[in-house]
């Protein structure tokens, strides 16, 4: 269906639904009457087949303790093979309530207090807090931005940081939040080779893997150089981003190496005492096996791409010195306003003049990004038009 039809069928006004993005603005902002473009979830209902699967299960079954549904396992394996050319084995799969919890468990299982953990900056701020909450040190290795506003890695700088700080763990974001970069196999091969050379364990957060809106195809970290690095790696994902179900607390944790898997599960057993969420498994099985869900995802990507192209066209015409990073993956636009706005004026501009609630740049790596915002484009074109015109009008 076209984007107008998709909006009419699936867009929903979420105010009053206890949405963190819409109803939780007081948690992050100075006012509560803002158009929210911050939290990374969608303003769209999930596909009907998923809604039906959940409702049918609840109507027919009590919500008691369950064991893992083998249909769920088969659905995950099939999805990875069909969508991402990644051949998983059943015993590689374990789970966590969400990707960030899985990362925190990995930090607990594979590092010690005061160890150093590397990330490529700018990056999702929860990586930093996951490390600092566990008394580990984040080593943020800044990426370089070229004239096309694409970010690249200086591999020499990355390796020097690994050595100087005796880094034990690298958290990789693939695709990369907030910059929208979809990593190529060559790029990841260079990063992972450095990690292996210096005995650095790798976590690959692949939660945005299905949200590819540009020309670069998604490559799972698990398949880089035909799986050459899987013995030193854990990959994680979830349908929460792809099908807008973050409230269903479930993420796949994929661990090919048996020793690492045992170590992870042993740590997990100390902090978590159940391993099956029947509603999440029901939703995942429907999402990964029903043609309607896959068609819905295709329509979402078209919607997001149209929103991104509109935003870029209007902002770049009105504000020619603005810098917008190419959004090849995710539904998140990363925009630098430094040519027009001072760092100290960003919050006032967006909150009090534009009446918008973006994710502010410093949330992704500190004051170096204070003139940036990340805008969530998984909403109606009408909302994106309103936000775009407000920005142009107030700068």
Enumerate the language-model features and the residues they cover.
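A structural alpha-helix within SAM-dependent methyltransferase catalytic domains
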Residues: 159-162, 192, 196, 351, ...
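Walker B catalytic acidic pair
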Residues: 206
């Amino acid at each position: 269906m076209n984007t107008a039809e998709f909006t009419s069928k699936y867009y929903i006004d979420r105010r009053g639904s206890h949405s963190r993005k819409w109803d939780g603005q007081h948690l992050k902002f100075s006012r509560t009457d803002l158009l929210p473009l911050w939290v990374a979830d969608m303003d769209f209902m999930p596909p009907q087949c998923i809604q039906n699967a959940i409702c049918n299960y609840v109507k027919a079954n009590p919500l008691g303790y369950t064991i893992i549904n083998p249909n769920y396992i088969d659905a995950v394996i099939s999805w990875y093979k069909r969508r991402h050319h990644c051949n998983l084995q059943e015993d590689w799969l374990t789970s966590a309530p969400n990707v960030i919890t899985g990362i925190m468990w990995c930090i607990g299982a594979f590092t010690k207090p005061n160890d150093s953990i590397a990330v490529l900056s700018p990056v999702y701020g929860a990586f930093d807090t996951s490390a600092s909450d566990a008394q580990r040190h984040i080593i943020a290795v800044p990426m370089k931005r070229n004239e096309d506003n694409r970010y690249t890695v200086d591999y020499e700088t990355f390796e020097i940081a690994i050595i100087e700080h005796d880094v034990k763990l690298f958290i990789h974001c693939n695709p990369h939040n907030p910059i929208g970069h979809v990593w190529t196999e060559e790029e990841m091969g260079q990063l992972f080779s450095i990690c292996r050379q210096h005995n650095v364990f790798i976590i690959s957060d692949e939660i945005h893997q299905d949200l590819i809106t540009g020309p670069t195809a998604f490559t799972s970290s698990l398949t880089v150089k035909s799986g050459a690095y899987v013995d030193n790696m854990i990959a994680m994902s979830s349908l929460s981003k792809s099908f807008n179900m973050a409230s269903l607390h479930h993420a796949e944790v994929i661990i090919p190496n048996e020793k690492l898997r045992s170590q992870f599960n042993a740590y997990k057993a100390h902090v978590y005492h159940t391993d099956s969420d029947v509603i999440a498994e029901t939703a995942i099985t429907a999402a990964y096996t029903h043609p309607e869900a896959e068609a819905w995802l295709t329509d979402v990507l078209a919607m997001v791409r149209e929103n991104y192209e509109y935003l870029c066209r209007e902002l770049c015409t009105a504000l020619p010195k603005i810098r917008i990073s190419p959004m090849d993956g995710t539904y998140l636009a990363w925009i630098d306003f430094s040519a027009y706005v001072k760092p100290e004026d960003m919050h006032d501009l967006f909150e009090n003049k534009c009446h918008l609630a973006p994710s502010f740049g410093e949330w992704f790596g500190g004051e170096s990004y204070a003139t940036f915002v990340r805008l969530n484009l998984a909403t109606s074109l009408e909302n994106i038009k309103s936000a775009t015109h407000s920005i142009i009008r107030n700068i």
